Amino acid sequence: MNKKDKKFNYIFGSEIVNDVKKRLPYYKSDWIDACHYRVLPACLNIYFSNLLPELAFALDMFAKTNNSFGVNEVLLASVLGSVVFALLSSQPLCIVGVTGPITVFNYTVYDIMHDRGTPYFPFLCWICLWSMIFHFIIAIANGVYFVKHITKFSCEIFGLYVAFIYLEKGVQVLCDQLKYGLTNTFLSITIALLFLMVGWLCDTVGKSSLFSYKVRILLLDYGLVASIIFFSGFQHIGKMREVSLAKLPTTKAFEPTLSRSWFIKFWKIPVGDVFLAIPFSIVLTILFYFDHNVSSVMAQDPSFPLTKPAGFHWDFFLLGITTGVSGILGIPAPNGLIPQAPMHTAALCVKRVDYDEDEIEKTHKEVIDRVVEQRASNFIQGLMTVGTMTGPLLLVLHQIPQCVLAGLFWVMGFSAIFGNGITQNVIWMLSDRKVVSKNHTLNHCSSKRVVWLYTILQLIGFGATFAITQVDKASIGFPIIILLLIPFRTYCMPKWFLEEDLEILDENVGIIAYQKV
């Protein structure tokens, strides 16, 4: 076992200092290395990959917090995370923005506190300020060390949970269209389904062997954006123009959705509510501890040949700062984005295509030569998001029908489901053994029953997490279930599985990434 696996540093703040010392010598090259052709497509790819889900999340929070949050708040949160982490973080490849889980957290807090008559934004600000303190304590006490216990077991459960949240949000958006009449609802469902089919087709063809490599990459990078543009205008064809579809609500440029200041007067709240915010802040800290660190781990996946060191402790300390600032500004707290973080690294990969010819067929395989590790792409997409808050672009965003965002939720959800390890395990278990490759990884397990048991445990974990989200006001506790999965995997599962089987089924992604630090 590597020495790093055994040693926990008991000197407060030492790991933060080590993170900064290791990354600082590369700071100049982080900007010089940005002079590469892969940076521009990475900027555009991540800008749209970040923007489109955030518009959907903005619509969700707008509806469920009585217009407290809107497009500008979500965009500003994305700018805060992108710019701060691009300039100061140890791992600038990790994309930071507004996630699905934080939207669930924010509107659940609203539901709980609204009934008590507690002012929402001051209370949310105190949640963020307390969470900032807890982030500092964890980072200074070298507590991010325990990210080494995060494995694919809990990551895949969380990924499946987020995917089903996307699907649920899409359905909820369409259900909301019922208040505009049956004709409006029917057209909305039709457009959402068409968007799903076209978006799914772009993704499938982009990952296939059809057409040339450049065409496939073009479909993967910009197919979803083109679909949104097309279906935003689709409603104006023929008699469909007679149906007035509900649009994405926007506000004035650089102004909050509600008539308020960007600075939250957090002192205008009863003292009791200040301390009542502590348990909520603990839950938020737990969510960010898992969500952000998993995002960072996935951005540094072993499949990416990264050469520059990262730093978990300094980045978590930095996340505490952005969490506190977001509370003061009255915006959703940004953190690591699980789909976008590895997508960003993948977009910066310099690849070559190797062809393997045999007597029967010709196959091709993409090989990653290196990754363009730099800060500019994250920083530039943050500046592009600032531009999105201007009046003309907000007017453009206002033209997007809500049903298109519902279709976007579905595309993200189904893509995440079919790319999830749990789904792949289920497909393997249900497949005909005669047509499954003999070299398939799961064939090396001691028995098929082992794969069944492992997958069933994952589905139970997913079911518990998703079920608590469906319970009003109790849904705020879903990060606790996610956290409990880590000790369950570490201490309980080794008693039920052979070590050799766990090595095949459950890669320890946390320790692999942490060893690079």
Swiss-Prot record:
List, alphabetically, the GO terms of the cellular component aspect: fungal-type vacuole; plasma membrane; vacuolar membrane
**Any single biological process term in GO:** borate export across plasma membrane
Subcellular location field: Vacuole membrane
Disulphide bridges, residue numbers: none
Among Pfam families, the record links this protein to: HCO3_cotransp
Q: What one GO molecular function would you report for this record?
A: borate efflux transmembrane transporter activity
Q: Which UniProt keywords apply?
A: Membrane, Transmembrane, Transmembrane helix, Vacuole
Q: How does it sit in the membrane?
A: Multi-pass membrane protein
User: Which sequence ranges are marked TM in the entry?
Assistant: 68-88, 93-113, 121-141, 155-175, 186-206, 217-237, 269-289, 311-331, 377-397, 403-423, 449-471
Please name the InterPro entries in this protein's record: HCO3_transpt-like_TM_dom, HCO3_transpt_euk
Stated family: Belongs to the anion exchanger (TC 2.A.31) family.
Q: What is this protein called?
A: Putative transporter C543.05c
- Species of the source: Schizosaccharomyces pombe (strain 972 / ATCC 24843)
Source organism lineage? Eukaryota, Fungi, Dikarya, Ascomycota, Taphrinomycotina
